[in-house]
Amino acid sequence: MTKLTFGALVALAMTAAASTAMSSKAMAQDAAAGKTSFNKCLACHAIGEGAKNKVGPELNGLNGRKSGTAPDYSYSDANKNSGITWDEATFKEYIKDPKAKIPGTKMAFAGIKNETEINNLWTFVSQFDKDGKIKQ
């Protein structure tokens, strides 16, 4: 009985370790797919070290940032007064239909409807801190 219990614990630990490794690999794949999706955003936005505002604001440190507060970017009153603090749920709702989430936004983008693509894009964007470095 003791051997069976010990064996079960070892098997459980190995399963948990494999699951964690697969989860990390899946997240890396999601970020890579999100980077590809971000190509749709590059005409207006920048992210990463040295990113600057373009037609749209740079997106470093988006997770936890209040809407309308990227330095040196001229936001619409709608964005400045939206009361939004960016997080995963808010971003996903916004990116599906920006003008529905923030009526009056200057963002001229029809949105992304594919849930997997939205998830991947969030994984990519949210990995950058306010200085454009990838969080560890």
Swiss-Prot record:
It holds the Pfam family Cytochrom_C. Its main location: periplasm. Binds 1 heme c group covalently per subunit. The N-terminus is blocked. InterPro entries: Cyt_c-like_dom (IPR009056), Cyt_c-like_dom_sf (IPR036909), Cyt_c_1A/1B (IPR002327), Cytochrome_c-550-like (IPR053567). Heme c binds at residues 41, 44-45, 107. Keywords: Electron transport, Heme, Iron, Metal-binding, Periplasm, Signal, Transport. One of its GO terms (molecular function) is electron transfer activity. Residues 1-28 form the signal peptide. PANTHER family: CYTOCHROME C. Plays a role in bacteroid respiration under conditions of oxygen limitation. Required for electron-transfer during denitrification. This is Cytochrome c-550. It comes from Bradyrhizobium diazoefficiens (strain JCM 10833 / BCRC 13528 / IAM 13628 / NBRC 14792 / USDA 110).
